[in-house]
């Protein structure tokens, strides 16, 4: 299982990456593996304000449909529109081309509450 050390994680299997004043968000390799082949992604709208812990979309696979939760509070400034036609990018590259959304105006307390890769990995055992 791939687990980049430079990302932060949630117990719900989302990852967060600081990116020059904004934060890129996706689901972990573990999560995509558990879901199986992803066939559809419901994305939030650009301009939406999302609240940590709230469902902000869904990911549909051949096995199930799973809600996607906001790991931090912030404003959606971009979504990965490529996922509309190629949702399988989450399976093939969850930490790069399979990113889901980008937030700004993120509450710093939410970021500091996220898990390091080591702490996230311990929770998988």
UniProtKB/Swiss-Prot annotation:
<dbReference type="GO" id="GO:0019464">
    <property type="term" value="P:glycine decarboxylation via glycine cleavage system"/>
</dbReference>
<dbReference type="GO" id="GO:0005829">
    <property type="term" value="C:cytosol"/>
</dbReference>
<dbReference type="InterPro" id="IPR017453">
    <property type="entry name" value="GCV_H_sub"/>
</dbReference>
<dbReference type="GO" id="GO:0005960">
    <property type="term" value="C:glycine cleavage complex"/>
</dbReference>
<comment type="function">
    <text>Is also involved in protein lipoylation via its role as an octanoyl/lipoyl carrier protein intermediate.</text>
</comment>
<feature type="domain" description="Lipoyl-binding">
    <location>
        <begin position="22"/>
        <end position="104"/>
    </location>
</feature>
<dbReference type="InterPro" id="IPR000089">
    <property type="entry name" value="Biotin_lipoyl"/>
</dbReference>
<protein>
    <recommendedName>
        <fullName>Glycine cleavage system H protein</fullName>
    </recommendedName>
</protein>
<dbReference type="InterPro" id="IPR003016">
    <property type="entry name" value="2-oxoA_DH_lipoyl-BS"/>
</dbReference>
<keyword id="KW-0450">Lipoyl</keyword>
<dbReference type="InterPro" id="IPR033753">
    <property type="entry name" value="GCV_H/Fam206"/>
</dbReference>
<dbReference type="InterPro" id="IPR011053">
    <property type="entry name" value="Single_hybrid_motif"/>
</dbReference>
<feature type="modified residue" description="N6-lipoyllysine">
    <location>
        <position position="63"/>
    </location>
</feature>
<dbReference type="InterPro" id="IPR002930">
    <property type="entry name" value="GCV_H"/>
</dbReference>
<dbReference type="Pfam" id="PF01597">
    <property type="entry name" value="GCV_H"/>
</dbReference>
<comment type="similarity">
    <text>Belongs to the GcvH family.</text>
</comment>
<comment type="function">
    <text>The glycine cleavage system catalyzes the degradation of glycine. The H protein shuttles the methylamine group of glycine from the P protein to the T protein.</text>
</comment>
<comment type="subunit">
    <text>The glycine cleavage system is composed of four proteins: P, T, L and H.</text>
</comment>
